[in-house]
Regions:
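Short glycine-rich substrate-engagement loop in P-loop NTPases that contacts/grips substrate
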Residues: 23-27, 64-93, 104
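Conserved AAA+ ATPase "SRH/arginine-finger" region at the nucleotide-binding site
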Residues: 70-72, 142-155
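Conserved AAA+ ATPase "sensor/coupling" helix adjacent to the nucleotide-binding pocket
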Residues: 140, 156-166, 195-199
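A short, basic N-terminal segment
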Residues: 1-35
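Walker A/P-loop
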Residues: 2, 31-69, 84-85, 111-116
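C-terminal helical "lid" of AAA+/P-loop NTPase domains
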Residues: 176-181, 187-201, 209-215, 233-237, ...
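A short helix-turn-beta junction within AAA+ P-loop NTPase domains corresponding to the substrate/partner-engaging
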Residues: 64, 134-148
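Conserved catalytic/switch belt of AAA+ P-loop NTPases
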Residues: 104-139
Length: 268
């Protein structure tokens, strides 16, 4: 069975969800593709934010020969095969997943072909490339950061997924609950939706089904609601006011909600 996240993989940049600072009218990646020009790029950001989706859309819109390798799984010989194919057939795009794990041997064989333009790479990573990728590779790539998706973006993606699930019954509140579990990760949200759908005997996905599959109900069903921001504000005010008990209380609430990023930002 093909996963819902793979079924929904876009073939056009206009179908990419979120990342409006990179894709859309007048945005840098969309402009490059519109002009039929691509430089080697590294897309980095948290899981499920659209790195693979953007790479997929790029190669389909440019209609160029491409291959996909994983820097961990694929061996040096696999990279050699791609290079030989490019030598015979001409320009090629090489999508490299987990590019931050690419060892020196693989980097060394690629560098001359990046220099010549025979191979253009699209590197995908969850790690900050400024810290994790060899400068020799990094200096030959344009680096784009992807942001966690908003709750609204996740809901858009879930609704696209729902259209692919036959005879599903689900209400808007349940969709929001699934989105709230995702932490900006659309793939995670789609996987949860799919598990809930197939684990329900009548194809009815309710909040109770979601909770039984994924555990406790999140404290905030929607991180765009006022309660979430009121808690963040109260946490910061209690720190500024040196109210230890209140700060610890609101810290515990945010920890329970699972939002570590916002805690780090407020405490740094």
């Amino acid at each position: 069975m093909e996963l819902l996240a793979n079924i929904l993989r876009p073939e056009k940049l206009s179908d990419v969800i979120g990342q409006s600072h990179l894709v859309g009218d007048g945005k840098v990646i969309s402009n490059l593709i519109h002009n039929k020009v691509l430089f080697s790029v590294i897309l980095y950001g948290p899981p499920g934010t659209g790195k693979t989706s953007i790479a997929s859309a790029i190669v389909h819109e440019l209609n160029m020969t491409y291959r996909t390798l994983n820097a961990v799984v694929n061996k040096k010989e696999d990279f050699d095969i791609v290079i030989e194919e490019a030598k015979m057939n001409g320009l090629m795009i090489l999508v490299i997943d987990e590019i931050h794990r690419m060892n020196k041997d693989k980097q060394d064989i690629l560098l001359p072909y990046l220099e010549s333009g025979l191979i253009t790479i699209i590197g995908l990573t969850t790690s900050n490339p400024y810290h994790s990728i060899n400068p020799a590779i990094r200096s030959r790539c344009q680096i784009f950061e992807l942001k966690p998706l908003s709750t609204d973006d996740i809901i858009i993606g879930l609704k696209k997924g729902i259209q692919k699930l036959e005879d599903i019954t689900i209400d808007d509140d349940t969709i929001k609950v699934i989105a709230s579990y995702s932490n900006g990760d659309l793939r995670s949200a789609l996987n949860l939706l799919e598990v809930c759908y197939y684990s329900s005997s009548d194809k009815k996905v309710t909040k109770e089904v979601v909770t039984s599959v994924n555990g406790k109900v999140p404290l905030f069903a929607d991180k765009n609601d006022s309660g979430y921001y009121d808690t963040i504000s109260a946490f910061q005010k209690s720190i500024r006011g040196s109210d230890v008990d209140a700060a610890l209380y609101y810290l515990a609430v945010l920890l329970e909600a699972g939002d570590l990023d916002i805690i780090f930002r407020r405490m740094s």
